[in-house]
Amino acid sequence: MYTLELLLKGNPAPIVVHQKEEEAANRAYQSIVNALQSGSPQSLELTCDRTGKKVFLLTGELCGVQMTSKSGSASPMGTRPGFLAQLQS
């Protein structure tokens, strides 16, 4: 199972879309990245394989996307996969 997390401007909770196949997840990820790089807002519809739910959004409200693979093992100490930003003062 692959998870795409879409980060929206001004919203702390990501929109999560699950894909069963790696190829489908990569296609969805690449379409999101291409839409973000185009610079002009576009409409985007994604379907979640886990629940069959759909989401429709404008890419102008997106500020990032992350794709992760869910393995059978739990993350150490309850941490999620992702990136850690170090802010310098």
Curated annotation (Swiss-Prot):
Region spans: Disordered: 69-89
InterPro entries registered for this protein in UniProt: UPF0367
Top-level taxon of origin: Bacteria
Family: Belongs to the UPF0367 family.
Protein name from the UniProt record: UPF0367 protein CYB_2632
Species in which this protein is naturally found: Synechococcus sp. (strain JA-2-3B'a(2-13))
